[in-house]
Amino acid sequence: MDPKKIARINELAKKKKTEGLTPEEKVEQAKLREEYIEGYRRAVRHHIEGIKIVDEKGNDVTPEKLRQVQREKGLHGRSLDDPNS
């Protein structure tokens, strides 16, 4: 997210605590927060999709649901053509 938008979120939060927000500012704050949260969720999802879990012996123990997502995206050498990947 653009640093200016994050600064605006913080500015609105401070103003809300000190003097309150106008109805327009409340709408702006809600939109900015939603945009921030969506970006955060997208980043976490991307990070989790890139994880490969292995046990002490080096065996892949990644949950099947995550493996399927990785197959669809071609991550970690997983392929839709190879269900064992």
Curated annotation (Swiss-Prot):
Any one Gene Ontology cellular component term annotated for this protein: cytoplasm
Region (Disordered): 62-85
UniProt keyword Metal-binding present: no
Main location: cytoplasm
Keywords attached to this entry: Cytoplasm
Family matches, as InterPro entries: DUF896
Transmembrane segments: none
Cell compartment(s), UniProt: Cytoplasm
SUPFAM superfamilies per UniProt: YnzC-like
Family, per entry: Belongs to the UPF0291 family.
Database matches in NCBIfam families: PRK02539.1
PANTHER family the UniProt entry points to: UPF0291 PROTEIN CBO2609/CLC_2481, UPF0291 PROTEIN YNZC
Name recorded for this polypeptide: UPF0291 protein SPH_1589
